[in-house]
């Protein structure tokens, strides 16, 4: 039985969405159990033989400063959910709450793995090859050093290797061009570190990639800082939404376009399902001594269910131990990079 701790109060919609998703998830996973963390009155209407309520009196708001979430709201649903992972009561925690708060609380309670300075958010985005590209970081770390990007590359490679049972997934460094001479000094230095890691056998480093390569599936892992990654993510979601709305408008234009829509319906449905960002919701916070998954704050029930699915798959595939093993193998390289650059910012 795989147990997940769910922050039922987090996100833009709270229990209205999270509880609906939890029911759908339990109905499709007979070997899963959920710890529903939140204010008991808000969760009172939910009953399932494989779900139990863990009370938490406080809620971390989407605009709460990190200091408030970490130091003042010590009985928040987010913190209590992560505490379940620390105490061994749950294999993973899932939250749609405040990203900064989730990262800070997770890092405070669970700590980072040896050789890792900062955890990274690592979602999987659909690509043209019918698979997914893992991109990290997508919002947790806005300002990154070259050494942080090396750590992200090792963690992302370990994640894809664990989920896909693949020995050496390809890794690309997001840049403004493929040439080694392009990019900021941080990116150039990161390229040097990644090439060294590739030569040492710790990575299958492809080289520099551009934004369109994420969706081409040029590499299985793309490494970038959180600012660039988050912009790329939100831009892709905006484009997908724009195309979907434009198609709906065009097919409603007249009787002939409506007839065409009927004929094309199966193809359009398959296409929309393939690019629907809700079905790719749920990103691992890599680099921690426990499994934590971040859902979009605006997630609906379908999207949050997929975040639960990702956490379940990670726990079932023993993701944490497999990532830890890969990072341990690369630890001398990571420590050497850290020592060359001096102490990293927290």
From Swiss-Prot:
Enzyme class: transferase
Pathway noted in the entry: Lipid metabolism; phospholipid metabolism
SUPFAM superfamilies: Isocitrate/Isopropylmalate dehydrogenase-like
Gene3D superfamilies listed in its UniProt record: Isopropylmalate Dehydrogenase
GO BP of this protein: fatty acid biosynthetic process; phospholipid biosynthetic process
Reaction catalysed by this enzyme: a fatty acyl-[ACP] + phosphate = an acyl phosphate + holo-[ACP]
Highest taxon of the lineage: Bacteria
Enzyme Commission (EC) number: 2.3.1.274
GO CC, alphabetical: cytoplasm
Entry keywords, A to Z: Cytoplasm, Lipid biosynthesis, Lipid metabolism, Phospholipid biosynthesis, Phospholipid metabolism, Transferase
InterPro entries: FA_synthesis (IPR003664), Phospholipid_synth_PlsX-like (IPR012281)
One example GO MF annotation: phosphate:acyl-[acyl carrier protein] acyltransferase activity
Cellular compartments annotated: Cytoplasm
PANTHER family: FATTY ACID/PHOSPHOLIPID SYNTHESIS PROTEIN PLSX, PHOSPHATE ACYLTRANSFERASE
Task of the protein: Catalyzes the reversible formation of acyl-phosphate (acyl-PO(4)) from acyl-[acyl-carrier-protein] (acyl-ACP). This enzyme utilizes acyl-ACP as fatty acyl donor, but not acyl-CoA.
The protein's assembly and partners: Homodimer. Probably interacts with PlsY.
Family: Belongs to the PlsX family.
Protein's recorded name: Phosphate acyltransferase
Organism: Delftia acidovorans (strain DSM 14801 / SPH-1)
Upper taxonomic lineage: Bacteria, Pseudomonadati, Pseudomonadota, Betaproteobacteria, Burkholderiales
Annotated gene: plsX
């Amino acid at each position: 039985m795989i147990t997940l701790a769910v922050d039922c109060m987090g996100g833009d919609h709270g229990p209205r969405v999270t509880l609906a998703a939890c029911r759908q998830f339990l109905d499709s996973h007979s070997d899963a159990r959920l710890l529903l963390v939140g204010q008991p009155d808000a969760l009172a209407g939910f009953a399932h033989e494989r779900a139990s309520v863990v009370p938490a009196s406080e809620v971390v708001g989407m605009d709460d400063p990190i200091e408030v979430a970490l130091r003042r709201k010590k009985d928040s649903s987010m913190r209590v959910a992560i505490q379940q992972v620390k105490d061994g009561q749950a294999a993973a925690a899932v939250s749609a709450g405040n990203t900064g708060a989730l990262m800070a609380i997770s890092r405070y309670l669970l700590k980072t793995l040896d050789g890792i300075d900062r955890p990274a958010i690592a979602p999987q985005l659909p690509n043209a090859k019918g698979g997914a590209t893992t991109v990290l970081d997508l919002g947790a770390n806005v300002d990154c050093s070259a050494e942080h990007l090396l750590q992200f590359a090792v963690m992302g490679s370990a994640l894809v290797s664990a989920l896909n049972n693949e020995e050496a997934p390809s890794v690309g460094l997001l840049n403004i061009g493929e040439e080694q001479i392009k990019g900021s000094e941080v990116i150039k230095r990161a390229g040097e570190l990644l090439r060294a890691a590739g030569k040492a056998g710790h990575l299958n480093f492809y080289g520099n990639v551009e934004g369109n390569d994420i969706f081409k599936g040029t590499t299985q892992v793309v490494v970038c800082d959180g600012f660039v990654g988050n912009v790329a993510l939100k831009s892709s979601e905006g484009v997908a939404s724009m195309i979907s709305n434009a198609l709906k408008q065009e097919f409603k234009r007249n009787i002939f376009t409506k007839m065409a829509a009927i004929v094309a319906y199966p193809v359009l449905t398959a296409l929309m399902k393939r690019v629907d960002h809700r079905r790719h919701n749920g990103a691992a916070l890599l680099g921690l001594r426990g499994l934590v998954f971040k859902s979009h704050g605006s997630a609906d029930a379908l999207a949050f269910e997929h975040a639960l699915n990702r956490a379940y798959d990670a726990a079932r595939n023993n993701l944490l131990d497999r990532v830890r093993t890969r990072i341990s193998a690369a630890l001398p390289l990571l420590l050497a990079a850290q020592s060359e650059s001096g102490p990293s910012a927290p």
